[in-house]
């Protein structure tokens, strides 16, 4: 075969080997690349690919590897059996048993995901783990695989050994399914305890000595109190979706459950984010935990380009529409995937049409790959999500939505529509998007600017992955300017406002701020105004969203004081309202001047108050009382302003003096002054203790300049600088600390590692988190007094509350005596205690009781007669014939509904008596003579 040129052209059959180089791009990290287990492959046709003059054997190995990858790309591991599937891949190196490896292969897993690769070895070592992973990243298998490996088989000793707590019924069912599939080949017993199921059935399940309990916190605590369960046998505890557990108000239940667990347990906590409440819970319930998170969770991609638009509050909806229409160029109407689905649905024959199960995308052949229109919009509250969803639907876009309190099934459908391409826009809150593993996006729009820099990183981290370009667009109001400046300090990037630097801006390295073009923005705002006038539902949604925004503004975190001061100067500058450099090619110099004039008119603030204007128009003289009052107020304000300016000039003078000293030092270096002879004598290997101290050393050692108060403070200070340990950090450069705080979370010290990973998200409907202050009393209209709000929040309104073992308040209805009544009804004696051997008699009694309780359908009914006028006539006719055949083929006994021919002794005695009476009657002589 002739030599082929070494070019970046696509290989034969359009085969992409990047999948072999980078496993799972969406969750990639800085770990070492996975080692592929070599297996004998079929010999590929020899190809001369001698790029660097290597040996022919190496080239043949590469060709065989590519051929094997190409062959495996066209098959699905879950559909193959036997030795055709790769046995476990990286799972083999984790020391798992053969049954578990076979179950993993049968499940379709070939290579562990990044979160599995990081957590499973640590869990196998017996350490407590706090793992940060989104839904869809394989975290369920990350804690189920080590659990099955540790438990191995069913224990004859009484007591559950594994406990998995999930926030919802759906997630618990999903976890049970994974446990069942990976537990094949073992005799481990697993039970599901969720709300809505029968308590009596769950009593029997817990009495059957299960090994693994998968439950929701509320129902498990109910059973713990009702059955007086002893949890001392539990060795493996998992809090799945822990942040959602606290968000849903399970903090008291988790505290009570945690109190009853033994101290020698292994505790795992998996969460999408790490709020402060969860950090406190982990410190209290986990022993020296290890924080594991991926680098993609904490870094902004260098390929991400950020754009910040300065807008007014009344123009936010119009700005969003302008970005979608003019910047992203998003089309309206149904998407290509929706049209393809409709065409495939219309082309099918009705007779051969088979109903597709929800979530089965094979019939449509969707590809969860991003398009240039895939956009996610972040809003503050769920009311904003509803409002924006209705507004964008009215504009003709294909939209999906999700928020925290949305039903689990509805949220799954909405997110799946976005992943499959049935919608181009997904409107979400931070709480809802926190645990969703969304594929790589093209654009992210921050409709409401985040209150923390880490939330911004969490939002935009979903785009610009795997070497792809991505854009983020943020709408910044005047009130959001301090938060934007905090973000700029956090990222350590240059701030560019308007066109002050001309065309020399880099959206990937700078924080570039500017306004939208006035013409397009005005058109979009007019359309929004028209829609609000015509659509009463959308108008009411906007009113509700406005009320929710007021509450959101009161509860969000405050920006730093320095950023708030800087924001006043930034917002008041002319460049704040200048057209963004992104629109450089959209207008001439005349158009720019027009934009500046309109911006000045829009930002005009009169110098006179309403009192002065009113008096001047009515021709009144200056001696009026209102004018005198305004003059006195203005004089006071001017005096304070001058005093503040003098203080700023003094601080600038001090800074100039310090910078001048640095400049002199730099000049000395530049002039090439010769060093002293003593310095030349110092060898390279000897440390130079007399070298110039760094700024950080000076900052730690010496206090900063504080004007004239320094002498007074030092004289009155009681601190001995040699022995005194301050409670504040020695470094006061908060911006530098924050910037360096974004690092990988594999530190051994959980306190230090969690400090950079902690991120509090405001609830999208005011949900209370763990250990947050709350209103303890409320006004009862009926009894005309204040009553405790505790009963309203824990779902036990109108019931008594009692103290649990940990001191937390729980509903007294948890101890209702239903378990004792059930045990007496089943005629069960003393229940075995934890640590005792389970008795076969108890298992037999439980199985018998369960069989006796469950109704078994034994009655057979004849099918309905076939109707010739119905479409299922042939089907019903066959059913009837089959039922007749079953009746005729029964051997022994009567047909269904027939009378039994077996007679009892009473029946025989009665029959004999009647027969004797008939005989006596017939034996009488005839009356006729």
Curated annotation (Swiss-Prot):
Motif (Q motif): 89-117
GO molecular function annotation: ATP binding; ATP hydrolysis activity; RNA binding; RNA helicase activity
Sequence ranges assigned to domain Helicase ATP-binding in this UniProt record: 120-292
Binding residues for ATP: 133-140
EC number: 3.6.4.13
Catalytic activity: ATP + H2O = ADP + phosphate + H(+)
GO biological process, one term: rRNA processing
Annotated ranges, domain Helicase C-terminal: 358-513
Bias (Basic and acidic residues) ranges: 339-349, 639-652, 858-884, 900-910
Keyword ATP-binding among record annotations: yes
Leading EC class: hydrolase
InterPro entries: DBP10_C (IPR012541), DDX54/DBP10_DEAD-box_helicase (IPR033517), DEAD/DEAH_box_helicase_dom (IPR011545), DEAD_box_RNA_helicase (IPR050079), Helicase_ATP-bd (IPR014001), Helicase_C-like (IPR001650), P-loop_NTPase (IPR027417), RNA-helicase_DEAD-box_CS (IPR000629)
Ranges for region Disordered: 1-48, 334-358, 639-691, 853-929
Biased composition (Polar residues): 20-35
Subcellular location: Nucleus, Nucleolus
Bias kind Acidic residues: ranges: 666-683
Pfam families according to UniProt: DBP10CT, DEAD, Helicase_C
Top-rank taxon: Eukaryota
Any single GO CC term annotated in Swiss-Prot or TrEMBL for this entry: nucleolus
Comment text on domains: The Q motif is unique to and characteristic of the DEAD box family of RNA helicases and controls ATP binding and hydrolysis.
PANTHER family cross-referenced by the UniProt entry: ATP-DEPENDENT RNA HELICASE RHLE-RELATED, RNA HELICASE
Family: Belongs to the DEAD box helicase family. DDX54/DBP10 subfamily.
Role played: ATP-binding RNA helicase involved in the biogenesis of 60S ribosomal subunits and is required for the normal formation of 25S and 5.8S rRNAs.
UniProt-recorded name of the protein: ATP-dependent RNA helicase dbp10
UniProt source species: Aspergillus oryzae (strain ATCC 42149 / RIB 40)
Gene: dbp10
